[in-house]
Structures are given as C-alpha cells and as structure tokens.
Amino acid sequence: MINRFSIEKVKGLEIVDSRGNPTIRVFIRTSDGVESFGDAPAGASKGTREAVEVRDENGLTVKRAVDIVNYIIDPALHGIDVREQGIIDKLLKDIDSTENKSKLGGNTIIATSIAALKTASKALGLEVFKYISGPRLPKIPIPLLNIINGGLHAGNKLKIQEFIIVPIKFNTFKEALFAAIDVYRTLKGLITERYGKIYTAVGDEGGFSPPLEDTREALDLIYTSINNAGYEGKIYMGMDAAGSDFYDSKKEKYIIDGRELDPNQLLEFYLDLVKQYPIVYLEDPFEENSFDMFSQLQNKLSSTIITGDDLYTTNIKYLKIGIEKRSTKGVIVKPNQVGTISETFEFTNLARRNSMKLITSHRSGETEDNFIADFAVGIESDFIKVGAPARGERTSKYNKLLEIENKFGLEYEGKYFYL
C-alpha cells in the first residue's frame, strides 16, 4: 500500500526576490498529489557564520541550486514521508556534509525544508501555524516595524541600520498594526515637509531613507511622529544597529555619527539614547563576536530587550555562549541563517528554556510568500520583524497575521506584555 504522505517529486525553480535578484523556490509533491513550496529569502547584512548560499555569475543566477534540487535532492527524498521533518532535514545535512551548508547551499536546503513543512501541513489539512504549534493556543506576535532605514539598507549617512516602532499597549494585533500605520503616515508627512517628497521613496524593507547623518535626527523624527499621531505611551521605539557593519576591526573602533568610539564609549552612547527616548528594543548593538559587551549593556539596561542576530545567526552553538555569558534577553530567528527548520526549532526551544524572547525575522530580499508569519505564530514568537507596512512582500506577512487573528480569534501578545 502506497503511503499517501510519501514524497513523489521535488522540483526547483529560479524565481525573483523583492530586490530583483534571483532566488530559489522548491516544490514538493506527495504521492497523493498534494503540493506546496518553499522560497529562500536573502539578506543584505549577513553574519559571517550564516549558512552559505549557492549562486553563480556573481550572484546573478541560482541555476546550480536548481540543478542540485532536481538531480540530487529529488532522488534522495523520493519515498520519504513528508511529515518526517527531522529525517528530511538530517538527510539534507548529511548529503551536504559541511558545517556552513556550502555544498548544497543554505538557500537550496532552507527552501526544501520549508517546502516539506508546508506540504505536510497541507496534506494533513492544517494551517501551517497549527501544524507547528500543535495543540497549544499561540498568540499573535508584536510587530517591530522598520520605518527609517540606514546602514546597508539605505543611501543616507546613518550608521544604524533600522529605526523601529513597537506598538505594545493594544488589545488586538489589528489595533496595533493600524496604529503603527498611522505613525508611518505621519512620518511620511513630516519627511515631505522637512526634506521634500523625493525622500519618501521606500527602501528594501519599506522604510524611508531621509538625508540624515545623525542617529538622534532619526530618533527625533520617529518620536515626533509617534506623539503627533497620538500614541505616546502606547507605541515605543527600537533600533537594529547592525554593529558589525560600522565596526573598524583594524582600529577596533565603531565609526558612527562622525566619531570613532571604542566599545565602552559606544555602550555609553546607547545608554544616553535609552535615557532620551522610549527605546525598548536594541538589536546587534556591537559587532558579532562581542558577547561580553552585549552582556554589559544588557546588565545596565534591564528593561530593554537587547537582541542578538549576527551574534547568534540562529545557531545553537553560539546561543549556548550567549546563554552562558547572559549576553541578551532576545534572539533573532531567521531559518535561512542556519539552513533547516529542524535546526531552527532546536534554537528556539533552547532560547525558550532560558526565558529568552523570540523575534522571528524576514530578510531584506523577500518574496510574496507569507510562510514566516505562520512560522512566527506557530513557534509562539514574542515579536515579528517583517519591515514597514509597505511593499507587497512585506504587507503579505501582515495580512496573513490579520487573517489568522480574524479567523481563529488568537490574542495579541502585546496585550499581556509588560516592560
């Protein structure tokens, strides 16, 4: 008797991401004819420990990745029960046999891993988030909306990569999201008034990139927008510094706002900002090997969620170091950083056991697939980062969360969140 869940076909397809770059989509079909797909997102700012993508012609094609799926992965997965996520992911890792997934490619592997999970949930007639969460009743995570871009995501002189708003004190996700959209619109008007309409064009993640040079200029703009929109005390602020991107390893200095700061001076810089503005979230404040500096900052800012992205790269090996050193309260969760869904689950489970906040995140190069929204709800993520409320590949994730809330009546994480 044929198992209706057995994998019959795995197929790769070269598609286009939100930055106009090629990426890979992997389809998996079962013997019962059930089919779904997984897309590989791509980051602009990457940690050095991330899984390596397979690309050709200076990144202009992923034809080799498609061939790997069609000629290596397809026969290897043929006949395996699509519900066996752990077996599928282990087989992919074994075939690859490298620590950084460089043989098959992190992009190839994560697209296949996502496709397996989505196909299994579809075959069982379950929503993806329900397939992940099981019998537990999860909540809708708090959105972290990146509304001003700097660093590698922008063409201005800001060194901080993302300036974020955090709508916490609302009863529903819908209320929180639409309040954040009010602030986004208010900011757009403020930028138009001060700098001209040309600077309201949006960047890779939907945020604005006004001609700013100083961190406080950006924070002032957002703080004013929050107050003008009437959400003081309900919408807070955050930053993704992407500290590795403005760290000069030769000088051992951070180059920011026209100054060269040593690690301790940068720590004081952040302490001053948190005193001046309602900042509750700070991601990658230092370069990716500075576990001790992260720890010092978190110790001084007990009410702020210091978070590691490049510090951990969704890798349990580095998370264990952060736990031992008490480096952060929060962890970024990006499945494509580590390469498989199973490894991502291991990472989130360890973080949860150590009372750390989960922040599920997109990448700057995304597709219209809304898998990450389902994934965030399913793993009971505290927060979700999918960009500004603009551009289809970002809004598709917000719309999926609105749909889940409306259809299943899930409560909003922010309703119960205390600072």
From Swiss-Prot:
The lineage of its organism: Archaea, Thermoproteota, Thermoprotei, Sulfolobales, Sulfolobaceae. It is found in: Cytoplasm; Secreted; Cell surface. It catalyses: (2R)-2-phosphoglycerate = phosphoenolpyruvate + H2O. This is Enolase. It is an enzyme of class 4 (lyase). GO terms for biological process: glycolytic process. (2R)-2-phosphoglycerate binds at residues 161, 334, 363-364, 385. Belongs to the enolase family. GO terms for molecular function: magnesium ion binding; phosphopyruvate hydratase activity. Mg(2+) binds at residues 240, 283, 309. Keywords: Cytoplasm, Glycolysis, Lyase, Magnesium, Metal-binding, Secreted. GO terms for cellular component: cell surface; extracellular region; phosphopyruvate hydratase complex. SMART domains: Enolase_C, Enolase_N. It comes from the Archaea. Signal peptide: none annotated. Its EC number is 4.2.1.11. Catalyzes the reversible conversion of 2-phosphoglycerate (2-PG) into phosphoenolpyruvate (PEP). It is essential for the degradation of carbohydrates via glycolysis. Binds a second Mg(2+) ion via substrate during catalysis. Pathway: Carbohydrate degradation; glycolysis; pyruvate from D-glyceraldehyde 3-phosphate: step 4/5. It holds the Pfam family Enolase_N.
